[in-house]
Amino acid sequence: MEAKAVAKTIRIAPRKVRLVLDLIRGKSAGEAIAILKLKNKASSPVVEKLLMSALANAEHNYDMNTDELIVKEAYANEGPTLKRFRPRAQGRASAINKRTSHITIVVSDGKEEAKEA
């Protein structure tokens, strides 16, 4: 059984979020939370909050024991890009892309559910 949580349009570039997600993928929930609390990255608090949400979803929606859960999937896709311009010399302007992320975390208890035929 698995439960997931999704955060959309987070104002951190997906490349930076993936650095943190790579650290917690495959870890137990408790270990992942400990890693996120100690990691000094801008995306750590956001990912930690999302992981807590996934754990709460698992407990509330599926009556799963949060102590047994592992982070099965953790990925960040690109969200909409905010396009801005910075004035430059001689009347020119440079484009600035402010990237956003859609972050998804899936937690699982390791047990496969019976598939309906």
From Swiss-Prot:
One Gene Ontology molecular-function label: structural constituent of ribosome
Domain of life of the source: Bacteria
Gene Ontology CC, one term: cytosolic large ribosomal subunit
PROSITE patterns, A to Z: RIBOSOMAL_L22
Key word Ribonucleoprotein present: yes
Alphabetized UniProt keyword annotations: Ribonucleoprotein, Ribosomal protein, RNA-binding, rRNA-binding
InterPro entries according to UniProt: Ribosomal_uL22, Ribosomal_uL22_bac/chlpt-type, Ribosomal_uL22_bac/org-type, Ribosomal_uL22_CS, Ribosomal_uL22_sf
Protein's GO biological process: translation
Pfam families (UniProt xref): Ribosomal_L22
Quaternary assembly: Part of the 50S ribosomal subunit.
Physiological role: This protein binds specifically to 23S rRNA; its binding is stimulated by other ribosomal proteins, e.g. L4, L17, and L20. It is important during the early stages of 50S assembly. It makes multiple contacts with different domains of the 23S rRNA in the assembled 50S subunit and ribosome. The globular domain of the protein is located near the polypeptide exit tunnel on the outside of the subunit, while an extended beta-hairpin is found that lines the wall of the exit tunnel in the center of the 70S ribosome.
Family: Belongs to the universal ribosomal protein uL22 family.
Cited PANTHER family: CHLOROPLAST 50S RIBOSOMAL PROTEIN L22-RELATED (PTHR13501), LARGE RIBOSOMAL SUBUNIT PROTEIN UL22M (PTHR13501:SF8)
Stated name of the protein: Large ribosomal subunit protein uL22
